[in-house]
């Protein structure tokens, strides 16, 4: 992974984020996340001579910026300049920050279940570093100095959308191809043109203004990201193909276990289960299945799942406060009527004797 780091000149405020590559998308996203974190925009940024910022060298000291950098500068309104070649004194500040943050963050922990978790951890480490008192800044920390600097910074802008947008045709496998990797969409869209937004870690697909697919981006060659729910119509026509399908290979491991335990030779019912999941959500369905396992582990069916889901829905309805007020008023009226009725029948007996 590539590490992007921003460091302020005065207060040494540090922001870092990991990306899959060092390309224009990651370069632009790093700025967007940095300014979003700050809540403001620095008026001037100084860059090392990296390829994603410098398109080409025009002369001994002149450099032409890339289109990606120009778009960021135009959108956020900041100015920029580049370090001079072979001038370590100009870029040493940032290079030391790279080494410092990397050592503090990953010296003792380097394995994470996902890039998202790694970035959450890295963000927490940067927050800790930014809270340290600095003797050379009168005992103030980086966050305190940043608050002073914000008075002279540019206003916050909405998050910059760095996506690369393409229009792609859905192939016969019901997938679109981005940089050699396949991503599934709804099987009814075969042959159609879909709008694809490509981010550094995400692929979003739209058809007629509606989002029809979302995938984590793949960076290997000829990798496939297949989602089961995109092929429900096809599998309904050919349920026997379910067990050995690519969609089944990439399904959630918890659902694979449910299939093995309760839906072998019941492929059509398992496909129907995915329709229920699309409506109610995976977590809710898994909770219901867990409840059914405790009651009747050998008899789990879609009908029972639907019944329990409906019960949960009814029990989760919010209490109508208006009805509660009516009920309380009714109780008070009954109490008043009760006070009018004698506790014993002695009075009635005496009245009858008279």
Question: What does each model-identified segment do?
Answer:
Residues 203-354:
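Protein C-terminal end segments and domain termini
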Residues 41-61:
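Acidic/histidine-rich, metal-coordinating catalytic segments
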Residues 68-70, 74-91, 110-112:
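RNase H-like polynucleotidyl transferase catalytic core
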Residues 98-197:
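Active-site-proximal acidic segments at structured loop/helix or strand boundaries
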Residues 1-12, 19, 46, 72, ...:
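Short conserved beta-strand segments at catalytic cores or DNA/RNA-binding microdomains
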Residues 1-14, 23-26, 161-178:
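Mobile-element integrase/transposase regions
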Residues 16-44, 219-223:
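Active-site beta-loop-alpha junctions of metal-dependent nucleic acid enzymes
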